[in-house]
Amino acid sequence: MASGKATGKTDAPAPVIKLGGPKPPKVGSSGNASWFQAIKAKKLNSPPLKFEGSGVPDNENLKTSQQHGYWRRQARFKPSKGGRKPVPDAWYFYYTGTGPAADLNWGDSQDGIVWVAAKGADTKSRSNQGTRDPDKFDQYPLRFSDGGPDGNFRWDFIPLNRGRSGKSTAASSAASSRAPSREGSRGRRSGAEDDLIARAAKIIQDQQKKGARITKAKADEMAHRRYCKRTIPPGYKVDQVFGPRTKGKEGNFGDDKMNEEGIKDGRVTAMLNLVPSSHACLFGSRVTPKLQPDGLHLKFEFTTVVSRNDPQFDNYVKICDQCVDGVGTRPKDDEPKPKSRSSSRPATRTSSPAPRQPRPKKEKKTKKQDDEVDKALTSDEERNNAQLEFDDEPKVINWGDSALGENEL
């Protein structure tokens, strides 16, 4: 069985699987990796994997009788000075009769193996699904229609429409399919206010991926419809749609960074959480009509109150301080910094799913140090770790108690 590397490949045409589309995997391959992404333990020495439902990942290409298999624990190690450091385990799913435990029958007891089966599955049968060749196919995103793992585990959220050329961001999933995403630690800025902005940006990116692609004509229509109904299309600046930013009068929200980035600036979506809906604006505002030579002017005065007990109160205050009458200014953390030896390197780590490689060691080593280096990762461990992020437990923000509720965005 091939290991998923260059060795073991043949000239036979690769099976065609659209892992970037909405369909789950249909056929096997010559590799020995799981078709699905890993579930990760939140802590070292975590309890055995348990599920709210059956524990079988959704795969509509299989009959109910074939929906059974096992989760296999994979120890993970992070390269560190003088050797390696253990990190929380990962668990991979394989169908019965495939993968590293292909010789086991369903239910056979073995350390690090958890057997799962959907209701109505024929656990006496063996699967012909095969396994994945990592050189040819991406991991397929995990989805559990009847409930995911318990609170001791999580997985990285990967959109179903991700293409092979676009590696997913490590947006950590909650421990259930009913709470699908929150920001991961790769590329995450410190502080609760940055988590708010990062989550807001993630929300709008996911909404754009789910919706239809916006054409140039559609974007132009969005930016030039009646002023009160305009929305900022992707790639547009704020002043292209709503005019130059000002101070002390209408159009005074937005600093230079927000104006340049438009809806890519996560603070936009964060503040939309406080903006009234059309109905709230009409029926909850003080409406003042005034006849002018050019027509009827309608003024809507609406007040949104953010409680000081709101978990995001300080974040909203910070954004308002930056953006109200913010023309000509930028956030302090966005100001250019002097180039240094480390900051002058290309910032590619946030887009890479691979673990950080250890720096080359200097030539001068003692014999003891040489022995410690020999205890570093084995080739098998490196291959397994190549699929994983060594990320910390994401910070949790209580969005349920925030200003207008978790469903307002």
Curated annotation (Swiss-Prot):
SUPFAM superfamilies: Coronavirus RNA-binding domain, Nucleocapsid protein dimerization domain. It comes from Avian infectious bronchitis virus (strain KB8523) (IBV). ADP-ribosylated. The ADP-ribosylation is retained in the virion during infection. Homooligomer. Both monomeric and oligomeric forms interact with RNA. Interacts with protein M. Interacts with NSP3; this interaction serves to tether the genome to the newly translated replicase-transcriptase complex at a very early stage of infection. Residues 1-32, 46-69, 120-193, 238-259, 327-409 are annotated as: Disordered. Packages the positive strand viral genome RNA into a helical ribonucleocapsid (RNP) and plays a fundamental role during virion assembly through its interactions with the viral genome and membrane protein M. Plays an important role in enhancing the efficiency of subgenomic viral RNA transcription as well as viral replication. Residues 215-331 form the CoV N CTD domain. Residues 226-333 are annotated as: Dimerization. Residues 29-160 are annotated as: RNA-binding. The keyword Phosphoprotein applies. This is Nucleoprotein. One of its GO terms (molecular function) is RNA binding. The modification Phosphothreonine is found at T378. It is found in: Virion; Host endoplasmic reticulum-Golgi intermediate compartment; Host Golgi apparatus. The modification Phosphoserine is found at S190, S379. Keywords: ADP-ribosylation, Disulfide bond, Host Golgi apparatus, Phosphoprotein, Ribonucleoprotein, RNA-binding, Transcription, Transcription regulation, Viral nucleoprotein, Virion. It comes from the Viruses. Residues 358-367 have a biased composition (Basic residues). Disulfide bonds join C320-C323.
